[in-house]
Amino acid sequence: AIKFKTDMKEAHNDLVMVLRKKGDNKSALKVCVHALKSHENDDTLHRNKGNILYALDEPEKALEAFEKALDLNPYVVDTWVNKGTVLWKGLAEREKALAAFDKALEINPNFMAAVDSRINLMAEIKANRPPFWKRIFGG
């Protein structure tokens, strides 16, 4: 039997996911913005909006969306990882990104996306750090 969802919020989220999967991020953003007009306190919609904006190469706006989602629900590990990713790869804010990944791991120490992201970020930080002697003696 076909089951219809009566909650439009879920339907909007589903449509956003389908459009993103098809690569139509602009349409997905329109749906998300429309849905937020009637569901402004839905952290999932804000997280989806952040993911879309990041895919559209708008990291500052994506960060705002993730921060709004976290204001609404600070216990969603995915949102912390997404925020960390935007800070790291979109805005080159490595220390802030590290703090976001650490927060995700504080909530769920076994969340592999957070573990992997933190490991990769630490490797990048280490690779870009000047040699020890330059940090001590300059030059």
What feature does the model see in each segment?
Residues K9-E10, D43-T44, V77-D78, M112-A113:
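Helix-start (N-cap) detector for alpha-helical repeat units in TPR-like alpha-solenoids
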Residues N13, R20, R47, Y54, ...:
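Position-specific recognition of the canonical hydrophobic site in helix A of tetratricopeptide repeat
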Residues M17, N51, T85-V86, N120:
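Residue-level recognition of tetratricopeptide repeat
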